[in-house]
Design a protein with these regions (language model features):
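Acidic, polar low-complexity linker/tail segments
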Residues: 8-66, 71-78, 91, 227-229, ...
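Von Willebrand factor
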Residues: 59-195, 200, 284
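Acidic/histidine-rich, surface-exposed loop or edge segments in extracytoplasmic proteins
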Residues: 60-73, 154-161, 242-248
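DG-centered beta-turn motif at the end of beta-strands
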Residues: 68-71, 178, 196-209
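Short acidic, S/G/P-rich loop/turn micro-motifs used as interaction or catalytic elements
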Residues: 71-75, 107-110, 207-214, 249-253
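Sec-exported extracytoplasmic/periplasmic mature domains
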Residues: 87-95, 179-187, 208, 268, ...
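Von Willebrand factor type A / integrin I
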Residues: 221-290
């Protein structure tokens, strides 16, 4: 009888230990699931973006505005050079920067961009968790970046495919107006996605031609500009970085090198865009001659 009671106690004790181990194991699993879920949640990117332009809902870190002068036609080889340069620009654009394509005609700046999209980021720019699909959808990342690349490239190609012609070329006024339109850069966080600086890339032959100032009529030197009303009308202190891709032309003996120097002088002496600014104003001659 005593032996039977001892056996029952041993079985009961063994059963209690087994139950404890099961409960402990279940708790370990639950804690692991909660910890794993918290880790995934903590590492998920919480920057919301718009479906239409792929830009953060809070705003882009900066805008790169391409301003295409459509007042005179461009040689096919020059158009190809522009396409190659813009493709490189799109590939190197930082994540959550906006790129917008604007045009100017004889009436000035068209304030509505032909296309405007933000770089949502390439998959190879993401962390391992995103690439492996734990905290993001890799295919969705690829699809968004493909939309950004293809839509912007298509807009540039279609715009360059048009015939350009106009009675005047209001370049300085268009630059001035575009500068006033660009939204202020936004910092998305304090470490990884800081606010940048807006940038305008002007693609033009630099031949300003308006009733206020004409580089066809007046000499291509700073004195002729200063003697006109152009400084008063078009003058502006630019916070944006300015870059110019110069379309080469052979017009009325006007030297492309003199045009380049004149624009550098105008920005330095009249617009306060110092030659010592970082980055400085750059004027890059495009391939071809029209």
């Amino acid at each position: 009888m005593a032996k039977s009671r001892r056996s029952r106690r041993r079985r009961k004790s063994s059963s209690s230990v087994g139950d404890f181990i099961k409960v402990f194991a279940i708790l370990i699993v639950i804690v692991s699931i909660i910890a794993g879920g918290f880790f995934v949640w903590w590492n998920q990117e919480n920057i919301e973006t718009n479906k239409s332009d792929l830009c953060p809902t809070d705003g882009a870190r900066a805008t790169v505005a391409i301003l295409l002068d459509t007042t005179d036609d461009i040689a096919p080889v020059t158009k190809t050079d522009i396409q190659n340069r813009t493709a490189k620009l799109l590939n190197e654009l930082p994540r959550f920067y906006r790129v917008s394509l604007y045009t100017l005609n004889e009436d000035g700046l068209n304030p509505t961009p032909i296309a405007t999209l933000c770089n949502p980021g390439r998959l190879d720019e993401m962390g391992k968790l995103e690439r492996d699909g734990y905290t993001a959808n890799p295919q969705m990342i690829k699809d968004k970046y493909s939309k950004f690349q293809q839509n912007m490239s298509k807009a540039i190609d279609q715009t360059l495919g048009q015939k350009f012609d106009a009675q005047q070329s209001p370049l300085l006024g268009s630059l001035q107006n575009l500068s006033l339109l660009l939204p202020k850069p936004v910092a998305l966080d304090a470490e990884k996605y800081l606010a940048g600086t807006n940038k305008i890339i002007l693609i033009s032959d630099l031949l300003e031609f308006t009733p206020v100032y004409s580089m066809y009529v007046q000499n291509t030197n700073l004195k002729s500009f200063q003697n006109s009303k152009a400084g008063e009308k078009f003058g502006k202190q630019y916070d944006e970085d300015i870059e110019i891709w110069q379309v080469q032309r052979n017009r009325l003996g006007i030297s492309n090198k003199k045009l380049k120097k004149l624009w550098l002088d105008i920005f330095d002496k009249e617009f306060g865009y110092s030659i010592y600014r970082d980055p400085p104003l750059t004027i890059t001659p495009l391939v071809g001659l029209e």
